[in-house]
Regions:
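C-terminal "cap" of GNAT-fold acetyltransferases
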Residues: 109-144
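Conserved GNAT acetyl-CoA-binding A-motif
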Residues: 77-91
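Conserved beta-hairpin
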Residues: 9-40
Length: 144
């Protein structure tokens, strides 16, 4: 089971933890002294019921184990929003293409950062290129 824990210094950065809380209570976990595994981190901002993901990183030893999908599922189940917007890095195109198909999203041929190839919207929403550009600009001005 995935859990997001706010990083201590940044309000937009969250550690991705793999827990086994669904099997044991927190009291039992503390007694057994089981550690939560840190499997990566995610940076995102919420604005007007839209989540803007600026970076999702899963450590290499935990890749290809569907943790990325679990993070997206966690966002859908724990936050109230209309859609997720983000950009696709060249090395993560495969993952985001699968997410777009799985969650009925769409790809847009606009990007803010130089090392990205396009942007995506999950699930499919009517958002103009100007709105996407403004949201990406907003997130980059706050995060970077």
């Amino acid at each position: 089971m995935i859990k997001l824990q706010k990083y201590s210094y940044f309000s937009h950065k969250y550690l991705i933890l793999d827990t086994i809380e669904d099997c044991f209570s927190k009291k039992d976990l503390n007694f057994m002294q089981l550690q939560q595994k840190e499997i990566g981190y995610i940076e995102f901002i919420r604005k007007n019921e839209i989540i803007i993901i600026s970076y999702l990183h899963i450590y290499t030893s935990y890749r290809h184990k569907h943790y990325g999908y679990q993070v997206i599922d966690y966002l859908f189940s724990h936050y109230k929003f209309k859609c997720i917007i983000g950009e696709t890095l060249k090395e993560s195109r495969g993952f985001w293409n699968k997410c777009i198909h799985k969650y009925n999203g769409m790809r847009r041929n606009i990007y803010y950062s130089d090392n990205c190839t396009s942007s995506f919207i999950i699930p499919r929403q009517k958002i103009s290129y100007k709105q996407i550009w403004d949201l990406l600009d907003y997130s980059y001005n706050i995060i970077y």
